[in-house]
Swiss-Prot record:
Gene that encodes the chain: lexA
Family designation: Belongs to the peptidase S24 family.
Organism phylogeny: Bacteria, Bacillati, Bacillota, Clostridia, Peptostreptococcales
Ranges of the DNA-binding region feature: 29-49
Active-site positions on this chain: 130, 167
Name under which the protein is recorded: LexA repressor
Length: 206
């Protein structure tokens, strides 16, 4: 399910689900524009048309906010499961490319709306043991809220040499320290770093 959606369409669909659940009615096209970072309402209309063509929503052309969320999953009824949203699992992160580019999304995973709160959220599969003392183990999945800034002590996803890494963030006098949570590993010291987001959750298969 959702394999036929690109990243922006999935983002719009999840945003509409959240707003309908929170307010009881769908957002306006202008609100969708602002929420997902698009400048043109015509671009949003194009994405909504695609979502309707693919059977995810139904619109009433005579009413500007009349959008009904449909479900094409036979095991799921959105009307009885309004608290869940599909969060994209990102397979890779590349410099200069949007995180939620279609080719980066490997799958989606349902998470409770109140768990992810607001903002764009994605999931990464962690490789390695650099964060084991923070309870993040090899092959865990971390839930990340997209943001470009961080506070000292935040666990972040940073982009280094075109690879995403999960570390604890510290801004110091003349550099940034990305600190592993593994006493056997050394910190990474950088003049500057690209922050992709803050880790807000972790889950694993037992």
């Amino acid at each position: 399910m959702y394999e036929d959606l690109n990243g922006k369409q999935l983002e719009i669909l999840n945003y509409m689900k959240m707003e309908i659940n929170k307010r009881g009615y769908p957002p306006s096209v202008r609100e969708i524009c602002e929420a997902v970072g698009l400048r043109s309402t015509s671009t949003v209309h194009g994405h909504l048309a695609k979502l309707e063509d693919k059977g995810y929503i139904r619109r009433d052309p005579t009413k500007p906010r009349a959008i009904e969320i449909l479900s094409n999953d036979p095991f799921s009824d959105y009307s009885h499961n309004k608290e869940m949203v599909q969060v994209p699992i990102v397979g890779k992160v590349t410099a200069g490319q949007p995180i939620l580019a279609t080719e980066n999304i490997e799958d989606t995973f349902p998470l409770p709306l109140n768990f992810i709160d607001h903002g764009n959220t994605f999931i990464l599969n962690v490789k390695g043991e650099s964060m084991i003392e923070a309870g993040i183990l090899d092959n865990d999945y971390v839930v990340i809220r997209q943001q470009s800034t961080a506070s000292n002590g935040d666990i972040v996803v940073a982009l280094i040499d075109d690879e995403a890494t999960v570390k604890r963030f510290f801004k110091e006098s003349d550099h940034i320290r990305l600190q592993p949570e593994n006493s056997l590993m050394d910190p990474i010291l950088l003049k500057d770093v690209v922050i992709l987001g803050k880790v807000i959750g972790v889950f694993r298969k037992l």
